[in-house]
């Protein structure tokens, strides 16, 4: 837990969201899951500067290794929302784990972060996460519900409208990255709602997600739990 890569456009990610209140993860997880500024007493954490990462990438390339970065969306974003709470549905820190998909600033943030990531990482692939989105806040968020209405999204027997809203943010990131010559990898939840054929699915919830992705002619990485 915590943000681990310097993003120059968003300094609070490493001044604040990279530092937990406890070095022991279990104690931190069960003790409120709060973050501190790097210069506050008790702050525990750290991050890679962009210069650090350039050095690591160069070393990896010398050893024929490609480093693929992961920028998680729309869930597992508590640390981002602690630093930039306006990107959450509530507008408050420590209330939500998912980005507000009805907020245009969310997409600006993600595109800016991905741009800096692409400037650092030569990998053809960028992992966009996509797993374990709770979506509960989206059901009562006026902005998310307005987005659902504007897109004409309807729930059906397979998935809720909010599940298809997750597909919207993933396909938005996919198009943004494809336009820059990159391809996405995502956890198997990204299958819900449809994907472009060049997307790679990483199956972690057993083997069924990978099988379904292969049936849809996607490349698959099997990593079942």
Each language-model region and where it sits:
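Substrate-binding cleft of carbohydrate-active enzyme catalytic domains
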Residues: 1-182
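A cross-domain feature marking catalytic cores of carbohydrate-active enzymes
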Residues: 69-73, 130-132, 188, 203-205, ...
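Catalytic cores of carbohydrate-active enzymes
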Residues: 127, 179, 195-202
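Conserved alpha/beta catalytic core and glycan-binding cleft of carbohydrate-active enzymes
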Residues: 191-197, 204-225
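Acidic/polar loop patches that form or flank catalytic/metal-binding clefts of enzymes
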Residues: 126, 178-188, 220-224
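Active-site clefts of carbohydrate-active enzymes
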Residues: 142-147, 187-198
């Amino acid at each position: 837990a915590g943000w681990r890569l310097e993003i120059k456009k968003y300094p609070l990610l490493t001044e604040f969201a990279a530092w937990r209140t406890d070095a022991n993860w279990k104690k931190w997880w069960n003790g409120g899951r709060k973050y501190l500024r790097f210069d506050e007493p008790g702050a525990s954490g750290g991050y890679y500067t962009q210069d650090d990462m350039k050095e690591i990438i160069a070393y990896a390339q010398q050893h024929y290794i490609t480093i693929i970065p992961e920028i998680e969306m729309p869930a597992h974003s508590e640390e981002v929302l602690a630093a930039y709470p306006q990107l959450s549905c509530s507008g408050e820190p420590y209330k939500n784990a998912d980005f507000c998909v009805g907020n245009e600033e969310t997409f600006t943030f993600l595109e800016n972060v991905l741009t800096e990531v692409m400037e650092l990482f030569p990998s053809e692939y960028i992992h966009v996460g996509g797993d374990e989105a709770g979506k509960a806040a989206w059901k009562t968020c006026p902005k998310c519900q307005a987005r659902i209405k504007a897109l004409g999204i309807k729930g059906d027997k397979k998935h809720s409208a909010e599940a298809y809203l997750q597909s919207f943010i993933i396909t938005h990131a996919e198009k943004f990255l494809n336009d820059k010559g990159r391809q996405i990898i995502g956890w198997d939840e990204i299958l819900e709602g449809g994907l472009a054929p060049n997307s790679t699915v990483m199956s972690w919830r057993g083997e069924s997600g990978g099988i379904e992705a292969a049936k849809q002619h996607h490349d698959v990485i099997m990593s079942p739990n």
